[in-house]
Amino acid sequence: EYLNVDSSIQAGNQISIENAAGLTNNNLLEAGNTLDISANDIKNSQKGILQANTKVHLSANNQVENTGLINSNGLTLIETGQKIQNLGTGQIYGDHIALQTSQLLNAEQQTAEGTKSAVIAARERLDIAAQQIENREQALLSSENQLAIGGKLNQNHLAEGAAQSLDNASARIQSAGDMYLSVNTLTNRNLHFSSSEKEVPNSREQVIAYQGSGSNEILDASHVTGWGGQETVYLDGNRYEDYTKYDYTRYEKQDYVDSSAPAYIVSGGTLTLDGQNLSNNKSQILAAQGIKILQNDVDNIDAEGEHRVIQSGTSRYHYVGWNSTGTSKRSKWNGSKPYNPADIVTPKKLNVVKYDGSYQGANGGVNPTQIQRVQTEAVDDKTNSEIRTITPDLSLPNQSLFGINKNNNNEPLIETNRAFTQYKNWLGSDYMLNMLSTDPANMHKRLGDGYYEQKLINDQVAQLTGKVYLDGYTNY
């Protein structure tokens, strides 16, 4: 018989439930030591909490579906025969999280409060063993230390072997320490990239230019060194009586990024990639201590665009001929003609993809990789200076790791879920304000708590430098 848990159940030591049909939890199941549930199917609804101090173990022949909270202060172990679906408001926390399944889906879902993205976050280590893994639409796979993805869990609940596929689609996989991804096919891709052609700021200018008869060069007025009345011009020292005068507008257009939601794979330690087909499509792979490639290299796919120089105006041909009596020369102009030469087109990469670190290939050699930086503000391409500015993303996060405090002025607007932080405080701007004796009452509401503020800073460092840490730093 299918079991629905609609009332709170708490035990000081252990809760063990075994049900062949299945179980749906709509309330609180909490154990002081271990929580063990075994069933064909296990569903933890949005209001459901499965929690234990030492260990949470969920075992399902078919699938586990979670839109609520699954949390332990020790090991969170979930094993299924078919699927683990962590959706929308779904949160899975633990010091050590170990997942064993055939298919893992960590993704977004529409809720009454809008779109929410699921999170699986470990305080010490995250191990995922699956054949097919999909992390989608701002969903998060995270570890505050090590993270490993493979094909099966060993007796110590560590991932080993190889998964068949990992699709990280406009979502994030991150670890503060080392990361090991053993996946036959890894796809890190941007689901929401778009670009369009726009005029380059300050590129428009009016041009007067000349082309001597028989010459292939069109030279602007700065090359005119003298006039011989109205009959001749001197272009770079050459005298021309017959020439074409051009009067046109010159301007530039190029492709700019309109929208982008890159996928992120970010390691604060060494990132080891072990797979046959590795693709980084308009997204970012960053590792502070380098990237180690055990099989095939990563195919970094950038967005392609064009830069065009456009010229549009009129031309008139000037020539000198004899008068009707043949006794003197006269300057003559033909009528105006449209001047619209073919655009000068140059391919242009939009520098969306990032792949940072020196990587060690299968042959043991260490090769530098180019760091590509995103230039988010338009810059006049005619200058030699480099200007890189980043506007941080200050939109409210939809990841379920973060909550929004709309009405409580004593708390930051964005607060990390306390079940994950275990009610610990993270160093943030409030500490700095206290040290400076600044009265927060005279200031605006803080945007986020310390954990979220650190995330914003880390994201800006990555965007500005293409690196996980600033030079000279080895941690957050």
Where are these regions (language model features)?
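Long, low-complexity, polar and repeat-rich extracellular regions
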Residues: 1-476
